[in-house]
C-alpha cells in the first residue's frame, strides 16, 4: 500500500510514557506521529507474516520428513529383498 492510498482515521490509546517516547523520536527524525505509527504497524504486520510463513514452512518440512522416512524405509526393504534375490540367484538356490 502506497502512502498516497486511501486512509482510515483511527483513535488509539497509548500509555503517556510511550507517547512521550514517540514524540521524542518524531522530533529527532522530523516526522509526524502518524508516520511513525504507520511505519511501526507496517513493520509489525510484516514481522508477523514472516513468522507465520516460517511456521508453515517448519510444519511442512516436518511433514515431509515423515514422508521421506517412510519412502526411505520402503526403499531399504526393497533393496534388501533385491540383494537376497541376487544372492539366491548367484548361488544357484
UniProtKB/Swiss-Prot annotation:
Quaternary structure and partners: Homodimer, forms a heterohexamer composed of alternating toxin and antitoxin homodimers which inhibits the toxin's endoribonuclease activity. Antitoxin prevents RNA binding to the endoribonuclease.
Task of the protein: Antitoxin component of a type II toxin-antitoxin (TA) system. Antitoxin that directly inhibits activity of EndoA in vitro. Upon expression in E.coli counteracts inhibitory effect of endoribonuclease EndoA. The EndoA-EndoAI complex does not seem to bind its own promoter.
A Gene Ontology molecular function term of the record: identical protein binding
Family that this chain belongs to: Belongs to the MazE/EndoAI family.
Domain of life: Bacteria
Gene3D superfamilies listed in its UniProt record: Met repressor-like
Keywords, ordered alphabetically: Toxin-antitoxin system
A Pfam family reported for this protein in Swiss-Prot or TrEMBL: RHH_1
CDD domains in UniProt: RHH_NikR_HicB-like (cd22231)
Protein name per the record: Antitoxin EndoAI
Signal peptide limits: none
Keyword Cell cycle among UniProt keywords: no
Biological processes annotated in GO: regulation of DNA-templated transcription
Amino acid at each position: 500500500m502506497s502512502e498516497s492510498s486511501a486512509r482510515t482515521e483511527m483513535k488509539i490509546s497509548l500509555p503517556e510514557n510511550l507517547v512521550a517516547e514517540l514524540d521524542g523520536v518524531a522530533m529527532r527524525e522530523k516526522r509526524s506521529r502518524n508516520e511513525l505509527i504507520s511505519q511501526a504497524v507496517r513493520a509489525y504486520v510484516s514481522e508477523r507474516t514472516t513468522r507465520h510463513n516460517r511456521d508453515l514452512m517448519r510444519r511442512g518440512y516436518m511433514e515431509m520428513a515423515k514422508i521421506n522416512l517412510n519412502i526411505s524405509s520402503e526403499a531399504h526393504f526393497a533393496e534388501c529383498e533385491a540383494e537376497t534375490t541376487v544372492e539366491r540367484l548367484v548361488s544357484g538356490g
